[in-house]
């Protein structure tokens, strides 16, 4: 009988056994010999440095993740952030003696070598988690002899350089899960739509099993059939090993093995997507950016904006900002009705888009008039046809209301009174006040600003209304928690004096509300741009300021869609999302004129009078009213009286005009004799003061001085 045919296979088996026996000896020597470590190249730890950049909410929860430069989802995960059941199952299945061995488990390695010698081929790898991390860092093959030498040497090097916890963290970050998924957190978010600390037993077992064969076991490809059956079999082996290691009970295992494995992949979280993109672009360094965003409120706001935009019609988008105006922190940022909705151009961030604000700037025009002593909320003003050279404003409904109060004019958003007041206040002064208060936009120096003839963004408008809500003090909007210098004195700037801001708030609290809202709880103003291209609403209570824009990003018309009917109901719905109770408004400053009747006002404030600017020195005419002292823009040093904590009064003197006179400092009447042309200002401290004098005919003069 010819035995040559059977001798050859036996020889090949014996040769393999000798190779594996030699390998076992070499591996042991390499693991224990420092001299052996010098034979290998340094371990490329930099390979683990590149991770997905994250944007987090104020509590550290994920808003959005971005792939690494090589297109991978690779997210850091601390052991404390992962399900304890998953960690226990991982160690029970992959490396029972992880916390004890020096990087190489001699028992597991010896068993693997003996099995390979006995069967003539590798049966189990014998790799520890440390060796697997070394392989992932090196990118070397799994089962080659050279790779095993390298893994042993690298494992010893890792154990010398890192703690066990750091090595475990590397595995949690680098374990392959198929496609471009790396690490347990990326896999948990993609396959189960949840953070890894919330994994069930069945889910944890899947995440232990998949890295052994990531491409064949990936959940977005393992549909019904042999691949799916093999996936369940691998998962169940992990579960059975966990039972044997007393990680879970038999009852828990039975329930877990009866569960199906999910198919497909979830989208990664993408809350506040426009803001996240902006921050990532603006901040090139840092793995995680922590924002001021309230994750739950952000999610609710996005749903509200999406639902309402869909109800308004095709191609209509919507944007909103919710701000805690006490700190300037932005709690929700909704840039569009849906970032991925191409039909609504959802990728465009409409919080930053420059649009016409409609009537939304009127409160600030009236606020300056209150400061200058030109008007009071109960001042009567005429709503009748008027012309300013070639400009003849008309009201939104093309009608006129005759004599109304300033309160009514602002609450009804009448156009003619607003333009009249701006003509007296001066568009130049309005633009300068915006600039001096730190606003980042510019408005034209003409009367059309009152009716929307300017360009600003939703962020700009929100910053203005934040200042109103704060009693006239402007602060920057804040998006990052790292910038903890909240609303400091160095950041604050005056937009309106407190009394003027309170008058505006008191008026806006009485503005007509949508049918679904309760009056008085929110001070707000709406706006509609020319041609029905933009609908706005901005409002505030004692804690939150919310601004809403509704429109088409391409600036096409939306006939019939106006601020009160489109944007205001959405704004009130967002207020409801912040909590059931509205925070109360601040109390009125002590120096406001609280009268609700026009007849009770000082005579110069009862009727709004447009200035009659007459040249001085014309025979037969009274000299025009003007402030003779102090001169405009003068600086006056405050002088203290010895033994007294107060400051000496500052003399004021007027010339011309018709008695009686009314004096105001920063819009607040002074206690002065109306039939004298001289009076005194008692300074409250250093700073700029606006001095106004008004005569019996309603003519006025103003000057600004600095006390130091």
Where do the model's predicted regions map?
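Active-site loop and adjoining helix of the penicillin-binding protein/serine DD-peptidase-beta-lactamase fold
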Residues: 155, 211-234, 285-297, 304-307, ...
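Soluble, non-transmembrane domains of envelope/secretory-pathway proteins that act on or interact
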Residues: 12-15, 34, 248, 262, ...
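Active-site SXXK
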Residues: 88-91, 95, 237, 242, ...
């Amino acid at each position: 009988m010819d035995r040559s045919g059977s001798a050859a296979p036996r020889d090949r088996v014996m040769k393999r056994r000798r190779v594996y026996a030699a390998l076992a000896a070499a591996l042991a020597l390499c693991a224990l010999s420092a001299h052996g470590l010098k034979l290998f190249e340094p371990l490329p730890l930099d390979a683990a440095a590149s991770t997905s950049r994250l944007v987090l909410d104020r509590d550290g929860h994920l808003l959005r993740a971005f792939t690494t430069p090589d297109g991978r989802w690779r997210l850091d995960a601390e052991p404390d952030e992962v399900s304890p059941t998953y960690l226990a199952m991982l160690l029970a299945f992959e490396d029972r003696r992880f916390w004890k061995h020096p990087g190489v488990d001699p028992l597991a390695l010896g068993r693997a070598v003996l099995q390979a010698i006995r069967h003539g081929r590798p049966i189990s790898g014998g790799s520890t988690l440390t060796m697997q991390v070394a392989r992932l860092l090196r990118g070397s093959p799994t089962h080659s002899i050279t790779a095993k030498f390298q893994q042993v040497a690298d494992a010893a090097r890792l154990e010398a350089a890192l703690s066990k916890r750091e090595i475990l963290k590397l595995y949690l970050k680098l374990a392959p899960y198929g496609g471009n998924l790396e690490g347990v957190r990326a896999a948990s978010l993609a396959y189960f739509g949840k953070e890894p600390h919330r994994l069930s037993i069945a889910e944890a077992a899947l995440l232990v099993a998949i890295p052994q064969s990531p491409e064949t076991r990936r959940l977005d490809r393992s549909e019904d059939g042999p691949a799916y059956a093999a996936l369940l079999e691998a998962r169940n082996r992990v579960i059975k090993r966990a039972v044997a290691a007393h990680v879970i009970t038999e009852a828990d295992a039975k329930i877990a093995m009866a569960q199906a494995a999910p198919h497909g992949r979830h989208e990664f979280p993408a809350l506040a997507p426009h803001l996240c993109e902006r921050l990532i672009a603006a901040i090139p360094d840092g793995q995680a950016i922590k924002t001021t965003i309230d994750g739950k409120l952000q999610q609710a706001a996005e749903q509200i904006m999406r639902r309402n935009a869909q109800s308004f019609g095709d191609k209509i988008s919507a944007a909103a900002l919710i701000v805690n105006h006490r700190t300037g922190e932005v709690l929700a940022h909704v840039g569009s009705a849906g970032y991925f909705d191409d039909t609504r151009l959802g990728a465009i961030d409409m919080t930053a888009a420059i649009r016409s604000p409609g009537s939304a700037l009127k409160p600030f025009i009236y606020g300056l008039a209150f400061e200058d002593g030109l008007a009071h909320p109960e001042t009567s003003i005429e709503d009748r046809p008027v012309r300013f050279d070639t400009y003849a404003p008309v009201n939104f409904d093309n009608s006129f209301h005759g004599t109304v109060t300033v309160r009514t004019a602002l609450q009804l958003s009448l156009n003619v009174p607003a333009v009249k007041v701006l003509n007296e206040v001066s568009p130049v002064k309005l633009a300068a006040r915006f600039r001096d208060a730190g606003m980042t936009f510019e408005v034209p120096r003409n009367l059309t600003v009152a009716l929307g003839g300017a360009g600003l963004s939703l962020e700009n408008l929100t910053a203005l209304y934040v200042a109103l809500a704060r009693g006239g003090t402007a602060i920057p909007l804040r998006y990052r928690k790292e910038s903890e210098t909240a609303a400091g004195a160095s950041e604050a700037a005056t937009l309106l004096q407190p009394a003027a801001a309170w008058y505006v708030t008191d008026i806006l609290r009485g503005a007509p509300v949508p049918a679904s809202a309760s009056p008085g709880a929110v001070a707000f103003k709406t706006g509609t741009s020319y041609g029905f291209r933009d609908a706005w609403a901005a409002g505030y209570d004692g804690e939150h300021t919310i601004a809403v824009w509704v429109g088409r990003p391409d600036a096409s018309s939306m006939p019939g869609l106006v601020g009160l009917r489109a944007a205001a109901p959405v704004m009130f719905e967002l207020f409801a999302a912040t909590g059931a109770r509205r925070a109360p408004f601040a109390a009125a400053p002590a120096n406001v004129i609280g009268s609700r009747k026009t007849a009770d006002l000082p005579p110069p404030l009862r009727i709004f009078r447009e200035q009659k600017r007459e040249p001085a020195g014309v025979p037969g005419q009274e000299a025009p009213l003007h402030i003779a002292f102090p001169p405009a823009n003068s600086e006056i040093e405050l002088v203290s009286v010895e033994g007294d904590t107060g400051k000496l009064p500052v003399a004021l003197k007027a010339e011309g005009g018709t008695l009686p006179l009314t004096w105001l400092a920063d819009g607040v009447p002074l206690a002065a004799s109306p039939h004298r042309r001289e009076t005194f200002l008692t300074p409250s401290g250093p700073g700029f003061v606006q001095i106004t004098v008004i005569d019996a005919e309603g003519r006025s003069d103003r000057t600004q001085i600095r006390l130091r």
